């Protein structure tokens, strides 16, 4: 770790950069332009590296942040009730390479959405961001974007991906606006030239907090480079660890404002601290009340993507119309959902709760089943979601509910701890046959993680002396989400890996 100072992304999957001939879409880890990029079988471009030219001033490092799911209270939360959101073990990974001082460029590459661009550091609008009335400190609390600063970065956003279709350009510009606003707010004209490369295992546009995960990665990477974070280290007290993650969370929220305009702050909070939160918003002119569940246990989860397109706005409007037609009845349903959320948080926060106990997990699972039934009564399920429940119930594997807005999207299944592996495999094969995407994940895991330097020890013969260095070429060549997770994942194939470190926020 660096010494401490004492004082997408919403997007499209599968697109790739086509290059526009402007000299800013082809980058190497030396920060220089390069041609002759080759394409692998998936259509994703690979960089040609020139390691001798890079002369990095600091070792490459990585940060990683999780996605999230709503576990209890979707839809009722829109009507002023409480909900619980928790981290999942699907994550985004950001690789940071510091370049030689002579390069004076900063490059952003989000490989999974085909975004790649390089800016000259001196050409960025530092004058606007460095004004005494505008300049922020790393510990500042920023609750709204400055219109003057937003305007100042627009010319540097507009030059990105000019030859891409408009829909893809919007995605790229959203990501770039978040990065540039953070980079210019926290950095200075003397900031070291760098290459920021992102890969993610979180499905995009599925309500799983992919953009917040990216925002947390960007904020934490910049704060680490500024040496404004303490830790993470094993002996750090929980209250100090929470202070560090809150510092990251504040700037991740700024990034989310760039992407979404008026975010709730829930997604970035979960992605930063991990575990889970209870959140409630009774007044939409004010931020929600967010209460961390610091000791939320890790729970085994099967996440299933129905691959059924859905519209959050449409599903929310359906419930609002139903409430208008049957106010007493729908209010009773919403009140019941609120009681389910309260019961779940009380149960999970009990000191005697055992996440390995079938009895305790059954209680949580029963609450999930009740919550789903109430959502069905509001008309926000879908035959594809009900089919998942049918398959899971038939095999007796766990307890399933929809997560998010419904009408398609994803379901979550809390897995029984005693379910035979062959039974789970049979279910997963059936899901694949019926065109579902499934992810075995963990609910309530760690938040932001740091790998400094970018070296992992897997405890295998493949390890080089001192561990396996994760260089940019390996990172970009990892095939799909499984390849990324196997190469740099917190757990990989062999359980907890030596290298990744987390701020320990638990009370115990």
Curated annotation (Swiss-Prot):
Keyword Transferase: yes
Catalyzed chemical reaction(s): (R)-mevalonate + ATP = (R)-5-phosphomevalonate + ADP + H(+)
Entry EC no(s): 2.7.1.36
Active site residues according to the UniProt entry: 267
Sites where the protein binds ATP: 68, 200, 205-211
Region (Disordered): 1-46
Top-level taxon: Eukaryota
One Gene Ontology term of the molecular function aspect: mevalonate kinase activity
A Pfam family assignment: GHMP_kinases_N
Protein known as: Mevalonate kinase ERG12
Organism per entry: Gibberella zeae (strain ATCC MYA-4620 / CBS 123657 / FGSC 9075 / NRRL 31084 / PH-1) (Wheat head blight fungus)
Lineage of producing organism: Eukaryota, Fungi, Dikarya, Ascomycota, Pezizomycotina
